[in-house]
Amino acid sequence: MFLSIMAGVIAFVLTVIAIPRFIKFYQLKKIGGQQMHEDVKQHLAKAGTPTMGGTVFLIVALLVSLIFSIILSKENSGNLGATFGILSVVLIYGIIGFLDDFLKIFKQINEGLTPKQKMSLQLIAGLIFYFVHVLPSGTSAINIFGFYLEVGYLYAFFVLFWVVGFSNAVNLTDGIDGLASISVVISLITYGIIAYNQTQFDILLIIVIMIGALLGFFVFNHKPAKVFMGDVGSLALGAMLAAISIALRQEWTLLFIGFVYVFETSSVMLQVAYFKYTKKKTGVGKRIFRMTPFHHHLELGGVSGKGNKWSEWKVDAFLWAIGIFMSAITLAILYL
């Protein structure tokens, strides 16, 4: 445990040192920054804020994880197979996000990768994770509240759905200052507790390291944000959470621990479906939420959508509290 804490502190310090240099480089090169939703007017002032900050905390987390995982394995208390499985997912999804951000920022291609291109790359990455790290482990049953449902090779489709789905869910959640970074920290702390109780110290190590790196990033990402993580960070973090839940054989827990991401994604899907349905029935499309993902709905009028506008800090606090509450419920189900 001491080794994990030390590694987490190192990741925090390195990220805090590296991010200002990344921001300075970004500004010196006059690289185009983040584009904002015009519908949320309080965000317009953020236009041009450096993005792709996830590149920094991912590089730090991956390097520190690699070094300390090797140290841990030499002490005969670590499993490099599980560690490399999770880290490979983080790396590959980070590369996909980096490519998407690069096209948006450096090539001035507004949408970056097309949805078809991004989904294809994510599916390929998910398949690599399954065939290289999941299939050799012999895992073919889904844990549903402690009951294992044997699905055989259909587990491959579940892995794809889980990893791709949550990578995009965290990506959707990353819409206001600090929301995604601390939401993921809350999720990782919860999985850290689960890993500790399972004596999976190899997984605990990389969890603590990513927590340290994310907290270092949050120093510059809280409101008013000096840098955003970009798709490079959010896609990698979502995939990491999915991979951890699979590695710990606690797949179902991510529906609770990741409730905020699930709800954010569901709000978008419901909004689109309801708009299309009402337009087909009445000729006029109607909306359930003021704007999606859900955090924008809160910004524009609170929970009801009809109240006063919420500040980003208030939205953050509300959704972080939900994340903590759902994580506590998960731990209660597991251990009480």
Swiss-Prot record:
Pathway it works in: Cell wall biogenesis; peptidoglycan biosynthesis
Entry cofactors: Mg(2+)
Reaction equation(s) it catalyzes: UDP-N-acetyl-alpha-D-muramoyl-L-alanyl-gamma-D-glutamyl-L-lysyl-D-alanyl-D-alanine + di-trans,octa-cis-undecaprenyl phosphate = Mur2Ac(oyl-L-Ala-gamma-D-Glu-L-Lys-D-Ala-D-Ala)-di-trans,octa-cis-undecaprenyl diphosphate + UMP
Membrane-related topology note: Multi-pass membrane protein
InterPro entries, per database record: Glycosyl_transferase_4, PNAcMuramoyl-5peptid_Trfase, PNAcMuramoyl-5peptid_Trfase_CS
Gene Ontology process terms (BP): cell division; cell wall organization; peptidoglycan biosynthetic process; regulation of cell shape
UniProt subcellular location: Cell membrane
Transmembrane segment boundaries: 3-23, 52-72, 79-99, 123-143, 144-164, 175-195, 201-221, 227-247, 255-275, 315-335
Protein name, as recorded: Phospho-N-acetylmuramoyl-pentapeptide-transferase
Species: Streptococcus agalactiae serotype V (strain ATCC BAA-611 / 2603 V/R)
